[in-house]
């Protein structure tokens, strides 16, 4: 079995994050896998790909030149001669489906995002029958794939893209006299809701325990967020830029916040739980299923700065409770997203693909 894993880009974050773990399982099941990226973007996923010894082919092109991308993909796949295509996200899926029609190769398609642009939703709904199997990366995305794309249960499976690592770095408990460190990881984009977080910080006001809030990530909103914080007189916020070692970043925190307007599974928040951090998150995607409200963290309505400020005040006001709460979050995550469970689901999908 030769699987061509087609992705939009090798950008750090997003759908590229789980590729090494997924390929590892497919290889363990006896498949030969090669990754085909339609464009490079920032290339920050490549160190992880290299560490996993992935075979990667990257097209030198942009994000809108779809005809050129289709020609490149068709040529590349005709040369590599896969037995199956595995696609991720809308562009890779649509182009992969077109190549599959020409090359008569079955397609398996991931869905990672809870939000789809209306045009993408219409396109995928019209072509969904071209993929033999659809995979949702979380409970929410799997349900939405069935509803929005009209994919029947016989062609839809759920494979959470997070594989827990018990050896990942863990955070240290907060101690009296320390600055309380709260953090977040994500691109500086409206969907991540960092403007809502800044609004919440402005509402928080004075706290008895000093704190700082670090956001690790780059993006087009950097200047706007800085200006918003400055206008609100917020001095506790630091935009730390891209974080190459998220495990070390998370291990240096006492709590984590994910104020997103939309998510699928949200790998970063689950990495935070893995590090033993309590998580405050918007109730979107998989997050309300992973967080036990008031026990392992808190959930708030997306876009609600007032509710977020209220929970932040509770967190900052009781820092001595955070370590125990984060410990419960970690235990629950290691059980729900164990490596054995991750591998078993992947191997069952691979067995199903052999029967196509």
Task: Write out the residue ranges for each language-model feature.
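A conserved mid-protein helix/loop that constitutes part of the nucleotide-sugar donor-binding site
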Residues: 13-21, 184-203, 220-226, 270, ...
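A conserved, positively charged/aromatic
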Residues: 107-136, 150
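Short hydrophobic beta-strand element within catalytic cores of glycosyltransferases
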Residues: 37, 278-281, 291
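Donor nucleotide-sugar binding/catalytic pocket of nucleotide-sugar-dependent glycosyltransferases
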Residues: 130-168
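A short, well-ordered alpha-helix in the C-terminal region of glycosyltransferases
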Residues: 307, 314, 321-336, 342-345
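Aromatic "clamp/platform" in nucleotide-sugar-dependent glycosyltransferases that forms part
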Residues: 242, 261
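Conserved acidic donor-binding segment of nucleotide-sugar-dependent glycosyltransferases
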Residues: 293-294, 298-305, 314-319
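Short His-centered aromatic/hydrophobic patch
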Residues: 87-93
């Amino acid at each position: 079995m030769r699987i061509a894993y087609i992705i939009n880009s090798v950008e750090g974050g997003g759908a590229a994050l789980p590729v090494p773990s997924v390929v590892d399982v497919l290889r363990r099941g006896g498949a030969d896998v090669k990754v085909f990226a339609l464009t490079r973007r920032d290339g920050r996923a490549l160190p992880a790909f290299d560490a996993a010894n992935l075979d990667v082919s990257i097209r030198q092109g942009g994000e809108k030149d779809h005809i050129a991308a289709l020609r490149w993909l068709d040529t590349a796949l005709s040369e590599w001669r896969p037995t199956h295509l595995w696609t991720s996200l809308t562009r890779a899926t649509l182009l992969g489906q077109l190549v599959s029609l020409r090359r008569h190769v079955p397609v398996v398609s991931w869905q990672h995002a809870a939000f789809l642009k209306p045009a993408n939703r219409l396109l995928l709904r019209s072509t969904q029958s071209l993929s033999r199997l659809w995979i949702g990366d979380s409970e929410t995305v799997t349900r939405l794939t069935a509803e929005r794309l009209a994919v029947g249960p016989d062609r839809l499976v759920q494979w959470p893209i997070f594989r827990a690592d018990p050896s990942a770095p863990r955070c240290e408990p907060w101690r009296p006299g320390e600055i309380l460190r709260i953090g977040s990881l994500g691109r500086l984009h409206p969907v991540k809701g960092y403007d809502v977080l800044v609004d919440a910080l402005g509402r928080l006001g004075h706290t008895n325990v000093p704190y700082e809030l670090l956001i690790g990530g780059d993006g087009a909103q950097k200047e706007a967020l800085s200006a918003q914080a400055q206008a609100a007189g917020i001095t506790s916020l630091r935009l730390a830029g891209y974080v190459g070692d998220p495990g070390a970043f998370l291990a240096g925190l006492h709590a984590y916040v994910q104020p997103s307007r939309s998510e699928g599974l949200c790998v970063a928040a689950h990495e935070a739980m893995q590090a033993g951090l309590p998580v405050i998150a918007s109730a979107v995607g998989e997050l309300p299923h992973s967080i036990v409200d008031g026990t392992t963290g808190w959930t708030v309505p997306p876009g609600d700065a007032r509710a977020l400020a209220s929970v932040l005040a509770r967190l900052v006001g009781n820092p001595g409770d955070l370590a125990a709460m984060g410990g419960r979050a970690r235990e629950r995550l290691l059980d729900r997203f164990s490596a054995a469970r991750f591998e078993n689901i992947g191997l069952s999908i691979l067995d199903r693909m052999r029967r196509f």
